[in-house]
Amino acid sequence: MWYLVLFSLLASFSAEPTMHGEILSPNYPQAYPNDVVKSWDIEVPEGFGIHLYFTHVDIEPSESCAYDSVQIISGGIEEGRLCGQRTSKSPNSPIIEEFQFPYNKLQVVFTSDFSIEEQFTGFAAYYTAIDVNECTDFTDVPCSHFCNNFIGGYFCSCPPEYFLHDDMRNCGVNCSGDVFTALIGEISSPNYPNPYPENSRCEYQIQLQEGFQVVVTMQREDFDVEPADSEGNCPDSLTFAAKNQQFGPYCGDGFPGPLTIRTQSNTLGIVFQTDLMGQKKGWKLRYHGDPISCPKESTANSNWEPDKAKYVFKDVVKITCVDGFEVVEGHVSSTSYYSTCQSDGQWSNSGLKCQPVYCGIPDPIANGKVEEPENSVFGTVIHYTCEEPYYYMEHEEGGEYRCAANGRWVNDQLGIELPRCIPVCGVPTEPFQVQQKIFGGQPAKIENFPWQVFFNHPTAGGALINEYWVLTAAHVVEKNSDPSMYAGITALRLADLENAQRLYTKRVIIHPGWKEDDDLNPRTNFDNDIALVQLKDPVKMGPKFSPICLPGTSSEYNLSPGDMGLISGWGRTEKRLHVINLRGAKVPVTSLETCKQVKEENPTARPEDYVITDNMICAGEKGVDSCKGDSGGAFAFQVPNVKAPKFYVAGLVSWGKKCGAYGVYTKVKNYVDWILKTMQENSGPRKD
């Protein structure tokens, strides 16, 4: 068994200061041992440096001298490390390596590791004391101004205007009291660009005439002041003070502050404070007087005219608010105002601000409502809704309004026009249920036929087609330009009429194709038996008041024999010439030829005298028909392709040869264009 014995030889040698000496590695010139650490502390007299020479180097080589090496250490810092086999760079000199230090102390350390594969002899070196020039050989100059060297020492001196401090190294100077009044000038630290004096406080004053501000400009390279300590405090500093503003303190290599300082003041104080240490060159600045400027952006949400990079004393600007904002002064609002740059650097009218435009409380609409907004300023969104289920909004996207820049509530589709709530047509709250086929129909509720209108004197009917218009037969109103009408009733008793909603006529418009009767003979021509009654006031829709739809013009609205429709009214029944309560019936469509074959009850009229045209519908069956008193009422049919009960007026009760058989109805589909055109031409400004 092999045992590896490791030992370490740690030694340190020092002696009294000498002017020269020799250093040899252990066992030199024999091979040095393993695992050795040995150091030599070299010291020469004060005021001298050390010159170290190596005449032999034979140490185990390794990368970065990591295994065996000789180190040269000065002030705790490694100045060199040698290993390997070195030879002289010059054939006439024994010197292999040399080091020179301006300090009087030096340490040499030799280290070997635990394993040496070959035999190495180590190193040989010697040193000598050399004179040091403290004024030039050291990084830190010992004197703040003049350094005077002699063998073994130095002394400091100052320029004539300076004095030497008690530390015999630093010079001080008195540098306060200067006042600068010119509009342009230059100021620098004492002795610039040479090192400024230590332990000094320099105060300068710049005083310009009113209306000008002091503007200081610096170049970074013109500033070299002792930097801040680890806590951020400046031992030497430059500070500016103007009114209630302070700039600085500043220190460091290169000016750390803004290169241009606009003080907004016509006076500026400058203080330069130094401590007992430092060898920096100081600073130099330039200043000039600039007309007092005012900040460019004094208001938000606005544009300035003229738009300039800089505004100065007495400049006037027009400030215009951006879209959606306005200026309010008392009860007056505007989109712009004027402001003047004042001598103190503040704008006149600085209290005015561009604030969001106020659109006010949204206007109400008829038959609808608007949500109450939290505020009514620019950008606020509100929504209008209609009173369902009796009204719907005319435009699907017409409910949302936004407070616009012009102070109006605006809809993307309608602009500033308010939305309109249109009555829902053709939808009864209680659809009519047919129980049996009887002459004169069966009792009905107004909720079955909410479009039913009663005409008094003579008794007749009409159909409400919107809030302002009633559709009826021409023969009902041809001799009455102001008919008496009621809506929302079923019974015709006097008390019922007094409580019903009276409809007042604005105008009666009879179709131009209707021929006037001569009153001498029974009427036999009912072609174009249709008229419109315009109301003075709109009808408020609800369970008892609701219009019936107009027919479409497509083929889907063509009627065929056998199609069933509803009629309603207060006409003659099998037992009574007229009835008190509203009745309804379901009636089938038949061919026009059927109506031609009905025997006339009036013996004075011949069947061939009656005019039958394509503007008419024939409907009815034995025992189920409209009769006198039902004239002008609606012949209602289910709207095509709609599952829920919804009705349109296909016909108007017009005439018949006798009751209880077949009747003739005005075909409304043929008159839709005339109806719409007439209503449009006679619709004045809405009251809603």
UniProtKB/Swiss-Prot annotation:
Cleaved and activated by C1R to generate Complement C1s subcomponent heavy and light chains. The iron and 2-oxoglutarate dependent 3-hydroxylation of aspartate and asparagine is (R) stereospecific within EGF domains. InterPro entries: CUB_dom, EGF-like_Ca-bd_dom, EGF_Ca-bd_CS, Pept_S1A_C1r/C1S/mannan-bd, Peptidase_S1_PA, Peptidase_S1_PA_chymotrypsin, Peptidase_S1A, Sperma_CUB_dom_sf. Cleaved and activated by C1R. Immunoglobulin-binding promotes autoactivation of C1R, which results in the cleavage of the Arg-Ile bond in the catalytic domain. Inhibited by C1 inhibitor (SERPING1). The keyword Cell inner membrane does not apply. This is Complement C1s-1 subcomponent. GO terms for cellular component: extracellular region. It is found in: Secreted; Cell surface. It is an enzyme of class 3 (hydrolase). Component of the complement C1 complex, a multiprotein complex that initiates the classical pathway of the complement system, a cascade of proteins that leads to phagocytosis and breakdown of pathogens and signaling that strengthens the adaptive immune system. C1S is activated following association of the C1 complex with immunoglobulins (IgG or IgM) complexed with antigens to form antigen-antibody complexes on the surface of pathogens. C1S is cleaved and activated by C1R to generate C1s subcomponent heavy and light chains. Its EC number is 3.4.21.42. Belongs to the peptidase S1 family. The gene is C1s2. GO terms for biological process: complement activation, classical pathway; innate immune response; proteolysis. GO terms for molecular function: calcium ion binding; serine-type endopeptidase activity. Specifically expressed in male reproductive tissues. Residues 292-356, 357-423 form the Sushi domain.
